[in-house]
Amino acid sequence: MKKVTAMLFSMAVGLNAVSMAAKAKASEEQETDVLLIGGGIMSATLGTYLRELEPEWSMTMVERLEGVAQESSNGWNNAGTGHSALMELNYTPQNADGSISIEKAVAINEAFQISRQFWAHQVERGVLRTPRSFINTVPHMSFVWGEDNVNFLRARYAALQQSSLFRGMRYSEDHAQIKEWAPLVMEGRDPQQKVAATRTEIGTDVNYGEITRQLIASLQKKSNFSLQLSSEVRALKRNDDNTWTVTVADLKNGTAQNIRAKFVFIGAGGAALKLLQESGIPEAKDYAGFPVGGQFLVSENPDVVNHHLAKVYGKASVGAPPMSVPHIDTRVLDGKRVVLFGPFATFSTKFLKNGSLWDLMSSTTTSNVMPMMHVGLDNFDLVKYLVSQVMLSEEDRFEALKEYYPQAKKEDWRLWQAGQRVQIIKRDADKGGVLRLGTEVVSDQQGTIAALLGASPGASTAAPIMLNLLEKVFGDRVSSPQWQATLKAIVPSYGRKLNGDVAATERELQYTSEVLGLKYDKPQAVDSTPKPQLKPQLVQKEVADIAL
């Protein structure tokens, strides 16, 4: 009995010692000017901006996984599209009178030009190396069938010619021409089927994971930058002097550490919402999140891969979210070409691919539960769509593939689970709550903490999104001559629009193409097309959009 008692006492002392050691460790504060939470492309991009703007600032990056760029930024966990609205039909909605609205498409394209300039600048500085390892020319195509959809694409093509950003786009309704552009899509197709396609040669495939790894590797070369892996944020507390004390747990040895930061960026992808809530800032109460995953069919068969060099986007079917458009894409991953088709929506309560099944429940609070309920009640069609996607069989997915690749063979394809996308739900005075497509920077009034919520267009516009964050949080510094000069060196078109300025558009595309090793030829004459018929559209209830 005495031995048992002694053993229990020893264990208790040992456990207490471990606890005291952890507390002691946590009490040893590390100080940093900027704390970047999350090792993805957003944190990497912001860190790279700040390294040029304020090279003396100290920075610490913490990532819960064993390496950077392993979640949504990983090349296999996203579609790898350089989103510039060249082919994504959801960015050009059709108005009630049949006309096409191009405002969103222009904004998306302008944003991607900023990303191209940012990456080109980093290549010139030696921060990014071997552009072909992370960006490649892959033509972007839209492809539709059926009289109404063909008429839509005619109208879209005509409308986009008003913008200098879309010069060089081709249009065809000829089977032979489209087969030349995308043989895999046309072979085996009914020759009587009414089809149409647009093609833009300057489209890109981007490996955002590789960009992230290279940016962070460059940051690590500086002595005032620290990267802590297998490190999970457990608490955020605002101090009286408006700095933040962030408690970080080492997932390998169980210890904890406090980091005192003047500015905190939460770029943790799906985990950003929960960390924003943990901060306790009032602005966090307006938000909730709803996770949606995506799956793709993948082919690595050389007979398939070598027969397709394009990203081909279709049109969402009636009753489906506009962003859910199927596409069959050439990808360049880990130096190898593959073809992906999808996405197919999946559902999990995880906010991250490597997250917890309790993520959705633990992010639900008394302040955001009502907006979530309103969104659910107001978007029954979206709920039906998600249920139908989850219920898809292997045969269903293969039949969807054959609409874009009529001669597809099952044995050439496997199913791949990509990343999670947490959709933004925001409190709304009129509707109670709304589902918001896109990304949103949420910060406190003092500009000491900011988080990025949302999923689309995401990584392809990391550079303009982080530029927006700088303007929102460091407004006084951004307006200073020093920061203005540096920002214009990083992004030559900063502060002005390219749209409408043909010479400026061509100049920037030529510059970024040369530096990034991309194809670019000055646009030729516009293709002649049948005049689109502007038919009044039936008024249908809009299906809320989501990012997959």
UniProtKB/Swiss-Prot annotation:
Entry cofactors: FAD
Keywords assigned by UniProt, alphabetized: FAD, Flavoprotein, Oxidoreductase, Tricarboxylic acid cycle
Catalytic activity annotation: (S)-malate + a quinone = a quinol + oxaloacetate
GO biological process: tricarboxylic acid cycle
Enzyme class: oxidoreductase
Superkingdom of source: Bacteria
HAMAP family reported for this sequence: MQO
Protein name per the record: Probable malate:quinone oxidoreductase
Gene: mqo
